[in-house]
Amino acid sequence: MATLPTPEESARAILAIFALNNSHADDVLMAGPANFAFRQAGGSEAEFQAGLEYAVQNGWLEIGENNTIKLTNAGFAEIKPDKNSN
């Protein structure tokens, strides 16, 4: 039986969605499409919410108006090494 991802792993999966969109600090994604991409990759709604909460608590993401998720400088710093790896 597969183990469930930790909230940190889910948060990093959400950051990976920003990375796939070539996002930078202060870029915004709509929560709905981000959630859809997360679930398409095998995650659940509960895992997405747990990851989002973890990322917000750690200053990686901010929840904005109109169902948006904003990548912070701290969040960008977390994904930046992954964006430059081969």
Predicted regions span which residues?
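A generic structural-conservation signal
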Residues: 27, 47, 64-65
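Short amphipathic alpha-helical interface segments
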Residues: 2-41
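Short amphipathic alpha-helical interaction segments
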Residues: 42-57
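A short, conserved structural fragment
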Residues: 56-66
